[in-house]
């Protein structure tokens, strides 16, 4: 489920104004925790440029067993290099304590951007660091590792399942020199070590959370 808002018309690319996107609520197994995400796209005419700009602010909200009130646990703000952003809610872990999400950042009007895999631990109220997946793959390869990573779910034992693929620079046919994944496939991430191991191509991802529409 994605909170993804744009100031532009999809078919024409014309600026149509500010917009907001809110996901449904994702409930953890056992029902103790709930989460939703929102993204707000604000259109503004920058005084220094002839072109209007679109800037996103995306937020993740979580409520716990002691309160029905949702509180923001992650706020992704625009930066000069990446005015666009969004949050994808992927799933809650089988034990119901950890939320897997994808934090997207990009620059409007270009192919520049990326996905950051994050895990929110509802018990400790902490988010995993942005570099966790890069660190795990670099450790596995034994050198700096560039790749395209996207979270897809949890294994039955509670480890993170993600897809990893080669990393290409914009307009290039060959992956960058640091690209360490030859072809797209499923990988298992141990967030404690951190470490990764490859999964079979036929791996089937289970779903554990409930969606409230």
Where are the model-predicted features located?
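Sequence signature of WD/YWTD-type beta-propeller architectures
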Residues: 1-93, 97-213
